[in-house]
Amino acid sequence: MEPLLSVLLPAFNAAPTLPSCLRSLQRQTERCWRCVVVDDGSRDDTLRCLREVAARDDRFEVVSGPHRGLVEALNRGLRRCTGRYVARMDADDLMHGERLAAQLRLLEAEPRLAAVGCHVRIFPRADLSDGRRAYERWLNSIDSARRVREEAFVECPIAHPTLMVRRAVLEELGYRDQGWPEDYDLLLRLLAAGHDVGVVPRRLLCWRDSPNRLSRTSPAYALEQFTACRAAFLASGLLAPAETYVLWGYGETGRALRRALLLHGKRPAFIVELHLGRLGKLIHGAPVISPENLPSHRGLPIVVSVAGREPRRQIRAALGEMGFDELRDFVCAA
């Protein structure tokens, strides 16, 4: 009988961290799984390590081939997955012993969920920057499918190595290379297709922060590529019915998002600013208005492009008091 759960684990030159990663998988309280490990043409001892583990534990299936990159490795491995659910894992991370069991319980109990993530602890802690600590706090504040949707255009609200997805859904979408992060792309496609993504609100993954991590070295993870990804999905989603929208915020993030949305034929009809010196002026042809003027322009979708969590909280509250509904009338996008 095939296990209910497949674990999809790509590996490239991961020999230093792979043994501890695999041990954390073997120590799961949920014992019935099969792990498809894809060696993406490693030049170190990754393949030897995998074959040694697979020789002792037949729950591991090793797939090897020439180096083709992460997206191809993920799709190659996905084709070998047979479980009803597919859990992602990276070769330099560690699972809490109850991760698989807790996520499996939630997916089995909530048929409406297509996928679930969990909270994380970023490590090693010694050299963790203030920015990474803030990102960890933000990730771990997201505790429901509703919150995943609300935060989806701020940053990726689920750490991808924590994701467990119904295989039928993942096979339908697959992974793709659009020049921006493949994990963020998948999450936004899940949501755009109407799927709900839940969260087990427990720290069930130790997420390694290292200078060699793909998110630090790949051009696909550059800030402008995240912005391009957000713009593409905003243009085909909330902003699809019209060519114009209201942009709240014209700082660095707002300016970058406006430029990215122009590539999709979307331009701001108005720009909301609190800066008194800008009120009544034009920015690239768009009048600058105060928040109090927004009810006069009801019907135009609103994109709140403000970087700070507290300012976003205040703006959400203000829009709610004016009768605007988040996700229907406005979204926040950093």
Descriptions of predicted regions:
Residues 65-81, 102:
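Glycine-rich, basic loop-to-helix element that forms the pyrophosphate-binding segment
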Residues 86:
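Short aromatic/hydrophobic "clamp" motif used to bind/position activated sugar donors
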Residues 98-133:
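Conserved donor NDP-sugar-binding/catalytic core segment of glycosyltransferases
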